[in-house]
Amino acid sequence: MTNVVVVGAQWGDEGKGKIVDWLSEQADIVVRFQGGHNAGHTLVIDGNTYKLALLPSGVVRSSKLSVIGNGVVFDPQAFVNEVEKLKEQGVKVGPDNLRVAENVTLILPLHRELDSLRENASAATAIGTTQRGIGPAYEDKVGRRAIRLMDLADPQTLPHKIERLLAHHNALRRGHGIAEVDSGALLRDLAAIAPRVLPYADSVWNLLDHKRREGKRILFEGAQGALLDVDHGTYPYVTSSNTVAAQAATGTGMGPSALGYVLGICKAYTTRVGQGPFPTELNDEIGELIGQRGKEFGVNTGRKRRCGWFDAMLVRQTVRTSGIHGLALTKLDILDGFDTIQVCTGYRLDGKEIDHLPAGEGAQARIEPVYETVEGWKEPTANARSWADLPAQAIKYVRRIEELVGCPVALLSTSPEREDTILVQNPFEA
């Protein structure tokens, strides 16, 4: 028995929600360890669709304990709204099955406003954020001026913390020519929301340590993807947190030895939202077709995703930077019916072949993909639940991906339905 870390092995939107839900049946605890409510995921269970952003995927199963770790940035109003929406759908959610790290950093309205100001200031400098305040909240965390969940329980120190925060933000707002934030109004808003979120507050590192010692199975749920990691991604077109597997330790307060098996999720093709390099992007009818078949639109934002062929170079790199033991390959069925499929097996930069994605923004923009043509398949893979259900060429495609990325496929997903999953290696039993 081991714990399992789930991370995206591309630029996010790989289908982590379904895989986490599938694994959560075997877990006792599901933990979010980074990001915020910028990374939406959709679960389809018994014909019911649940759209989550901030909450762990395990929350739709009331018998599981869901946890939001200290590595997350936490919008209290978004949290309340998401909890209420689930309750309306008949899901039992409360402090008995959902906990939030008491030292989690809060996202406030001023963070969202600053995010939007920056994104809309100039198209040339836009990163393509969701404008939900994620980056500015992480900035305040690192700048040691953030307001954390535990601060809402201390009316003696909260006013001082607000003044310190606003000394920074009101200076920025004056520079942008917008109204300053009134400290009294912010204090009243926080006092109003506090009773709705404080019952969920807990010492998460301590809670998880006790659960681990009791032999409970813990599933760590990453948001976004490893290629959006602030250090190892396509900087500056990245998110503001670490998204690689190692963040599961720092984002929950557990030691690295507690993490266990690392499962990387990737699509059978590649997608990306927002700005930034994309070596295998298809700006043609094939890219449009993949996007239509795969319903490639953001859960939270509705933004259209850019689509391209599978990039083995990128996934191989994330296998290494996250220490991935096995892959969950999703949306294989979207490639049904293609005569041929292209797979990126290498890069060319300024006329020379290279074996990794360079760190520099300029070099990333000049990358040229080297393709290998793979024979497609006509028979459907949709709803397949065993290798015997798959066409021979589809199996060959999966095996070729394993060879190119240097990592075995542990799970194969052939539709949004959780039952349409082919298990090769159970991560909890690895």
Swiss-Prot record:
Pathway: Purine metabolism; AMP biosynthesis via de novo pathway; AMP from IMP: step 1/2
Matches recorded under PROSITE patterns: ADENYLOSUCCIN_SYN_1, ADENYLOSUCCIN_SYN_2
Main localisation: cytoplasm
Reaction(s) this enzyme catalyzes, per UniProt: IMP + L-aspartate + GTP = N(6)-(1,2-dicarboxyethyl)-AMP + GDP + phosphate + 2 H(+)
InterPro entries documented for this protein: Adenylosuccin_syn_GTP-bd, Adenylosuccin_syn_Lys_AS, Adenylosuccinate_synth_dom1, Adenylosuccinate_synth_dom2, Adenylosuccinate_synth_dom3, Adenylosuccinate_synthetase, P-loop_NTPase
GO cellular component annotations of the record: cytoplasm
CC cofactor note: Binds 1 Mg(2+) ion per subunit.
Coiled coil (UniProt feature): none
Quaternary structure (record): Homodimer.
Family: Belongs to the adenylosuccinate synthetase family.
Stated name of the protein: Adenylosuccinate synthetase
Source species: Nitrobacter winogradskyi (strain ATCC 25391 / DSM 10237 / CIP 104748 / NCIMB 11846 / Nb-255)
Chain's gene name: purA
